[in-house]
From Swiss-Prot:
Organism this protein belongs to: Ehrlichia canis (strain Jake)
Name of the protein in question: Pyridoxine/pyridoxamine 5'-phosphate oxidase
The UniProt record lists the keyword Ribosomal protein: no
UniProt remark on cofactor binding: Binds 1 FMN per subunit.
Cofactor(s) for this UniProt protein: FMN
Reactions this protein catalyses: pyridoxamine 5'-phosphate + O2 + H2O = pyridoxal 5'-phosphate + H2O2 + NH4(+); pyridoxine 5'-phosphate + O2 = pyridoxal 5'-phosphate + H2O2
């Protein structure tokens, strides 16, 4: 039976993958595909930090390559490869930057080393001297010992607001099951179809 709400279906599958005993892969890992202003694509793995009816959230340095690409072209695709439970979820949607408060809250929960890394890493830039980079981490670690570490302005939360969600489940003899959900400007109404495998 087809579920009418893809977010609820995602919740069911996500709970299943979180409960799966094999821990060799991070179930929050998702491939994020973006395009620059010339429509040249790039992809990388990021971690899902939160999801809801509003979308799928990750955090990043907005000055990184992916940050620049979502600024220039605010659309993205996500793929959750859960092959170890014979499932995959594909998402396409609009990209929005979250309010500073959301980024502040998540940043505050991060380990000290991750906070310092966010300050010291010029993500996606050429690293010409690794020793200098490591020394800058040591220096900042000493400077902020026992102190609160503020969030850099360029470290932001990003939400992918889904406009298309596809659920794929492996079947015998490659007779897989695929359900595709889409919505247009009426954000409350999802249309669902089954696709040939």
């Amino acid at each position: 039976m087809i579920k009418r709400d893809p977010i609820k279906l995602f919740d069911l599958w996500y709970d299943e993958v979180l409960a799966f005993p094999f821990k060799g892969k991070d179930p929050t890992a998702m491939v994020l595909a973006t395009c620059n202003k010339d429509l040249k694509p790039s992809a990388r793995v990021v971690l899902l930090k939160k999801h809801s009816d509003q979308g799928f959230i990750f955090f990043t340095n907005i000055n990184s390559r992916k940050g620049k690409e979502i600024t220039d072209n605010p659309f993205a695709a996500l793929v959750f490869d859960w092959s170890y439970i014979a499932k995959q979820v594909r998402i396409e949607g609009k990209v929005k930057i979250l309010p500073c408060q959301d980024a502040d809250e998540y940043y505050a929960s991060r380990p000290v080393g991750s906070k310092i890394g966010a300050w010291c890493s010029k993500q996606s830039s050429v690293l010409e001297d690794r020793m200098s980079f490591l020394k800058s981490i040591e220096k900042m670690t000493a400077e902020f010992h026992g102190k609160s570490i503020p969030r850099p302005d360029y470290w932001v939360g990003v939400v992918v607001v889904p406009m298309l969600m596809e659920f794929w489940q492996e079947g015998l003899n490659r007779i897989h099951t695929r359900y595709q959900y889409t919505r247009s400007n009426n954000m409350d109404v999802w249309n669902v179809v089954e696709l040939y495998p």
